[in-house]
């Protein structure tokens, strides 16, 4: 995560990742088949944690208070995970089309929380 955030997905090698986590390069393949799978897993975990944390938020009846709660949640969640957020937004272009579609679907689910509020507030 740190290496991708600092140097970018394309600039980081599997050898660098292995050295960073303290294993031999060959041993890294026991945990992930390739760099693409690692990137996808990091992004997927980030989005699933975001969705889970959002579901855990209490629902407020007042639309203005609901927008405020959503905004505070969104900002706090993202400030607590700057590397994951950076990767989730900046490295989408490096996903395979299939992996991109999966992450984009998770992102749409999160955005739907805001759109649901918007519709209910009208």
Where are these regions (language model features)?
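Helix-turn-helix
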Residues: 3-37, 41
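Alpha-helical elements of Rossmann-like donor-binding domains used by nucleotide-donor carbohydrate transfer enzymes
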Residues: 16, 37, 41, 66-69, ...
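Amphipathic alpha-helical packing segments from all-alpha helical-bundle domains
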Residues: 45-51, 98-122
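Amphipathic alpha-helical segments used for helix-helix packing
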Residues: 79-98
């Amino acid at each position: 995560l740190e290496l991708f955030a600092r140097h970018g997905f394309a600039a980081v090698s599997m050898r660098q990742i292995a050295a960073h986590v303290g294993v031999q390069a060959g041993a890294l393949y026991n945990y992930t088949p390739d760099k693409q799978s690692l990137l996808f897993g990091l992004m997927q975990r980030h989005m699933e944690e975001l969705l889970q944390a959002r579901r855990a938020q209490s629902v407020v009846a007042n639309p203005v208070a609901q927008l405020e709660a959503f905004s505070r949640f969104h900002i706090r969640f993202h400030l607590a995970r700057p590397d994951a957020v950076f990767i989730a937004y900046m490295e989408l272009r490096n996903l395979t089309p299939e992996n991109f579609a999966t992450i984009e679907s998770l992102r749409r689910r999160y955005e739907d929380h805001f759109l649901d509020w918007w519709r209910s507030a009208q």
